[in-house]
Amino acid sequence: MSIDDKVRAIVKEFKAYVPGKSKEEIARNYGIDPEKIIKLGSNENPWGCSPKIAEKLMDEVSKLHQYPQPINPELMDEISKFTKMPVENIIVGGDGADEVIDNIMRILIDEGDEVIIPIPTFTQYAISAKIHGANIKWAKFDEENEFKLDIESVLNNITEKTKAIFLCTPNNPTGNVIPTEDIKKIVESTDALVMIDHAYIEYSNEDYDLTDWALKYDNVLVLRTFSKVFGLAGQRVGYGVTSKKIVDYMMRIKPIFSLTRASQASAITALQDKEFFEKCLNEGIESREEIYNGLKKFKQLEVYPTEANYMLVKVKNGMNSSEFCEVLLKKGVIVRDCYSFEGLEPYYFRVSIGTFDENERFLKIMSEVVE
């Protein structure tokens, strides 16, 4: 008997997650100077994290032999002030929002339960739901209607077996938001948990933030992250805002020390450096508009409106997305080929914001490729 006979059948069905490519990988594979590579593929903050974090991390070096606090009161207080939500309604994850997603599946899902996921969207939802035994009911962001959520495709899939519904807004990779009236209708149509993923909410209209819905409804969990505008993708800090009951259940099965000392210190400092946060947010929105307007000039591309720090682009010059992205890679440009996103045809790629210098170089290279 081989190890294959011991592995769960559901795991054998999975394909490994395809992340955005790194500068190191492209430099190694294509022989390009890493300093000349333009990385616009992973929805990161191109200005990095607060410069105050480096000094704070030095203070932690002498303590790395000690376990971190399972719950850091200072971090919880800072998140509470930032979100204007009570501490008791917040749970922090040490693998970004992915940990919160996985833990909520662990407390909700029994074999055969159902989870509704509109696609195309963030692929981790389906991976986590499936591994815990859920059956996926696919809804859709309608490609024929600028990827607006087809709300009926969600409502028609709700049954007594539905345990959770994932709503990413702004949606990854399409960049658009789901109208609040549609989310309200879904939340009030079921007692299943509705997970509102707000990973990119800072880049959206400030009036759209639905984090306080976690207090209005018992069946809402709002996901937030430090990986985007705060520039801490490498530290893996995410959190959820939800009812006290759900927080209590999640704390029973949450990994104890998943948030490292370095991660905690980084997140606290990032929240305290409000000036750097505002700079990154304002320049990020300006960068987004610069790339969007630049790409709109190319007739061979269809660029979709966005309220995130990235935008979805469709190739219309005869190439598929993988061929197009390969051409860009050879020129030192990393964008995200979206072929691996369920529900998308193989003609889409996603572009993240860059610094203004990176944007200028990127748009120049794009003009060489598409014209």
From Swiss-Prot:
Modified residues (N6-(pyridoxal phosphate)lysine): K228
Domain of life: Archaea
Co-factor(s): pyridoxal 5'-phosphate
SUPFAM superfamilies: PLP-dependent transferases
Pathway: Amino-acid biosynthesis; L-histidine biosynthesis; L-histidine from 5-phospho-alpha-D-ribose 1-diphosphate: step 7/9
Gene Ontology BP terms: L-histidine biosynthetic process
CDD domains attached to this UniProt entry: AAT_like
GO terms assigned for molecular function: histidinol-phosphate transaminase activity; pyridoxal phosphate binding
The protein's Enzyme Commission number: 2.6.1.9
InterPro entries on file: Aminotransferase_I/II_large (IPR004839), HisP_aminotrans (IPR005861), PyrdxlP-dep_Trfase (IPR015424), PyrdxlP-dep_Trfase_major (IPR015421), PyrdxlP-dep_Trfase_small (IPR015422)
Catalytic reactions on record: L-histidinol phosphate + 2-oxoglutarate = 3-(imidazol-4-yl)-2-oxopropyl phosphate + L-glutamate
Family membership: Belongs to the class-II pyridoxal-phosphate-dependent aminotransferase family. Histidinol-phosphate aminotransferase subfamily.
Protein name: Histidinol-phosphate aminotransferase
Species of provenance: Methanococcus maripaludis (strain C7 / ATCC BAA-1331)
Native organism taxonomy: Archaea, Methanobacteriati, Methanobacteriota, Methanomada group, Methanococci
Gene: hisC
